Swiss-Prot record:
Keyword DNA damage attached: no
Reaction equation(s) it catalyzes: 1,4-dihydroxy-2-naphthoyl-CoA + H2O = 1,4-dihydroxy-2-naphthoate + CoA + H(+)
UniProt organism field: Parasynechococcus marenigrum (strain WH8102)
Protein name: 1,4-dihydroxy-2-naphthoyl-CoA hydrolase
HAMAP family registered for this protein in UniProt: DHNA_CoA_hydrolase
Length: 152
């Protein structure tokens, strides 16, 4: 089995278009980067985008379970500039059978530059009622927690 680091430790290149007129990362980019890192993590783990996200090319039908964002936050610790190569560390956590969050830390070398959190809630796509997480996401969460000590 591949180590969780394979899908939980990623890289992000800061592009010119990610920055504002002062050459610093524009604030709204951080949450987009958090979501994109989560998408990449799922893909690296082996979960096809079409099994989680609606509207993917070639998708026969939308997933039965939707995972809307119900909470997010962002903390900016240090300025992030164009051409920075950031290491992204993901820390997913199941909160209950139908809810999870992914904390993202963006590092430049050993310095934490920014942190983000995105929380998702599982709902049936048709009824919009709460439900359990999709099995693939549940397995990703379980595999991501391997080797970590968690409280009961």
């Amino acid at each position: 089995m591949t180590s969780p680091d394979h899908w939980l430790k990623l890289e992000r290149q800061v592009h010119f278009g990610d920055t504002d007129a002062a050459g610093v990362m524009h604030f709204h980019q951080l949450l987009r980067w958090c979501h994109e890192a989560w998408e990449e993590s799922l893909e690296r783990y082996g979960i096809a985008a079409g099994s989680v996200f609606p509207g993917c090319r070639g998708q026969q039908r939308w997933p039965a379970v939707a995972l809307p964002v119900v909470h997010c936050q962002a903390d900016f610790k240090r300025p992030v500039h164009g051409s920075d190569r950031l290491q992204v560390h993901l820390k997913p956590q199941r909160l209950d059978p139908g809810c999870f969050e992914v904390r993202s830390e963006f590092h430049l070398d050993a310095t934490v530059m920014a942190c983000g959190l995105v929380r998702h809630l599982a709902i049936h796509s048709d009824s919009r009622e709460r439900c359990a997480l999709p099995e693939t996401v549940d397995l990703w969460l379980e595999a991501s927690a391997l080797g970590q000590i968690t409280s009961l």
